[in-house]
A protein has these predicted regions:
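Generic N-terminal amphipathic, Lys/Arg-enriched alpha-helix
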Residues: 6-23
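C-terminal helix-cap and adjacent tail motif
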Residues: 3, 17, 175-212
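Small-aliphatic-rich amphipathic alpha-helix that forms the alpha element of a beta-alpha
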Residues: 33-38, 112-114, 119-166
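Glycine/small-residue-rich phosphate/adenosyl-binding loop
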Residues: 53-131
Length: 212
């Protein structure tokens, strides 16, 4: 029988791991992560998700150029102006910012990327499109954590969507929704930093405290 306590423990300790060793990751582990992704719910079970596994350094370097540009022009300045989110101290937030900067400079060095995509044909992405791909992304993040691998969900490349999707070689009608850099973590796994439920959960009416 499955140990559900282990599942909840993994959820509580699957934080973004942005500092990754460049050492190769066995294909067997990547396959397990992909299987976990393909077990996720999706709209109408249409399974329009597509997963592009990137190991080619030249492709990663081509994307990293735009990834860094997005940091320099948008993400970096936003961090400098932002206060720490709920459940996170200033010291923790500064460490997070440093890790984001590290990933910016070393994004292409992660041994494996999984690019989560949807095959959408001529239809434009809609507000609900993500419902058919982001559950798979979360499954893959949890699977990576269970296997002792570090990963993070990043969508920053979408600030230069056309340029990065061209570098990735995506065909017309296929859109990327996230990139998961995966590798063995340099640091230790630990609990996620989150605020209390009382600040984010309501009952029956917006603003009415949830008392359970």
């Amino acid at each position: 029988m499955a140990d559900y306590d282990d599942l909840f423990e993994i959820m509580k300790n699957t934080r973004a791991m942005r500092r990754l060793h460049p050492d190769p990751v066995p294909d067997e582990l990547i396959r397990k992560i992909l299987i976990a992704g393909a077990c996720a719910p999706n709209g109408g079970n249409t399974q329009r998700w597509r997963f592009l596994v990137i190991k080619d350094t030249k492709i990663k370097q081509a994307v990293q150029v735009w990834y860094k540009k997005a940091f320099d022009e948008v993400v970096g300045p936003r961090y400098l102006k932002s206060a720490p989110p709920p459940g996170v101290t200033r010291e923790q937030y500064d460490r997070q910012h440093a890790a984001v900067e590290y990933l910016t400079d070393h994004f292409h060095e992660a041994p494996v990327w999984i690019v989560a995509c949807l095959e959408e044909g001529t239809a434009s992405p809609t507000r609900w499109s993500g419902a058919s791909i982001y559950p798979a992304v979360q499954n893959m993040l949890l699977a990576a954590r269970a296997l002792g691998l570090g990963a993070t969900l990043t969508t920053r490349h979408l600030l230069f969507e056309k340029e990065t999707e061209a570098a990735l070689g995506l065909p017309p009608g296929v859109h990327s929704y996230a990139i998961l850099p995966i590798g063995y973590p340099m640091g230790k796994f630990g609990p996620v930093g989150r605020g209390p439920l009382g600040e984010i959960v309501y009952e029956d009416r917006w603003g009415n405290p949830y008392r359970a």
